[in-house]
Amino acid sequence: MRAKDALGRFGEDVAARHLAAVGAEILDRNWRCREGELDLVVQDGESLVFCEVKTRSGTRYGSAAEAVVGRKAARIRRLAARWLAEHPHASSLVRFDVLLVSRPSTGPVRVEHIRGAF
């Protein structure tokens, strides 16, 4: 596994544990269709939440939040529409969150959960 892939998997694991700890139910993880992949789909109370996970080991490429704008957000919305088409009984209250996982070379891992990010 490439280092980038391993870092991404690590971040998704941390994000999934964080979401479960705050009471969200993981419905899907790494859901794929021909247009791309959704990192996490969770039920948070009455809301169906599509979560994009961004993991960084440093600030060399900017913050993880900067990576989920414009076309990336639009693509996630399209993927969410595809997921909903395959799951017609899912909640109609939809939210898009971003989880930023920071894994510095020293110190603790940090998770920032941005609800309703876009």
From Swiss-Prot:
UniProt superkingdom: Bacteria
Gene3D superfamilies for the chain: 3.40.1350.10
Family matches, as CDD domains: PoNe_Nuclease
A Pfam family hit: UPF0102
Coiled coil regions in record: none
MF terms in GO: nucleic acid binding
InterPro entries attached to this UniProt entry: Restrct_endonuc-II-like (IPR011335), tRNA_endonuc-like_dom_sf (IPR011856), UPF0102_YraN-like (IPR003509)
Similarity annotation: Belongs to the UPF0102 family.
HAMAP family assigned to the protein according to its UniProt record, in alphabetical order: UPF0102 (MF_00048)
Official protein name in the record: UPF0102 protein Francci3_3586
Organism: Frankia casuarinae (strain DSM 45818 / CECT 9043 / HFP020203 / CcI3)
Lineage start: Bacteria, Bacillati, Actinomycetota, Actinomycetes, Frankiales
